[in-house]
Amino acid sequence: MALLTEKRVKKTHAPASDSSPEESDSEGSQNSASEAEGNAGWADSIQKVLKTTKPKTQKKTVLARAKKSQAAVRFQKDAANKKPGFDFEIEKADVKEEDEGDNHEDEKPQASALDATLTKQQRKNVPLQLRVKPSFRDMERERTLRKVATRGVVQFFNAVRIQQKDLQQQLEEAGPLDSRQDAVLNNINKRKFLDVLMSGKRAKSTPVDNAVKKEEQETDDDDEDKGSSGKKKSEWSVLREDFMTNKKIKHWDEEDDDEEGHNDEADDSDYDDGEE
């Protein structure tokens, strides 16, 4: 029985082995045929893509647009937002503090840029802010200041000229010896120059802001204010309240009578002379 079973198994395996090379030959021939023919669908699709014309309104070509597909964009966003992994854990409070610190660092350059622009604007506006519109009330003060300035400059140059003349004269008197000339130069004193400067004809202290004149102006202003509160000074004398009580016009009618009497007497005398 064992021998019969072995013979049957050999018979079954034998045709299988015979059929395998035939099948392999058929598969190889099909593969070679497919390689020779190629993929017709792929060739057609590539041909259509190559034949497509580029639209005038669109700058990018078909193949270049494929780079910006949704999948590629998502992948790039994920890669950008992806944080590096760490072996340790970070507490939430620390993360918030770091985020706040990053925000402050981001805000600092903006503030510095604003400060720079503000400083530039302020520098441009500084000359405009220093300009002051002159007032007619300050004209006299400006004139006095100009006079004082001119006098001071003239006095200063006169003092320098006098000092130079004195020094030249002393050097001539000292002679050609260097030791004597050095002694003369060492005797130059700052105090002497100031004495010469303050002893000139124009060396007079002129008060620019006169306190007495200011007080007089203030009193005049107060009087004007009082007069404006009541009645004006340049008012007709008849309209004043003390017109009738004034001593000068108290006996105005008597004076007129006396004048009329004198006039009548003069007329009578003239008339008598005419009759004679």
From Swiss-Prot:
Keywords tagged on the record: Phosphoprotein
GO CC list: preribosome, large subunit precursor
Entries under Pfam families matching the protein: Rrp15p
Region annotation (Disordered) ranges: 1-132, 201-276
UniProt keyword S-adenosyl-L-methionine, yes or no: no
Residues recorded with modification Phosphotyrosine: 271
Domain of life where this protein originates: Eukaryota
GO BP, one annotated term: maturation of 5.8S rRNA
Phosphoserine carried by residues: 269
Positions with biased composition (Basic and acidic residues): 75-95, 226-245
Composition-biased stretches (Acidic residues): 254-276
Keyword Cell membrane listed: no
Family to which this protein belongs: Belongs to the RRP15 family.
Protein name: RRP15-like protein
UniProt organism field: Drosophila melanogaster
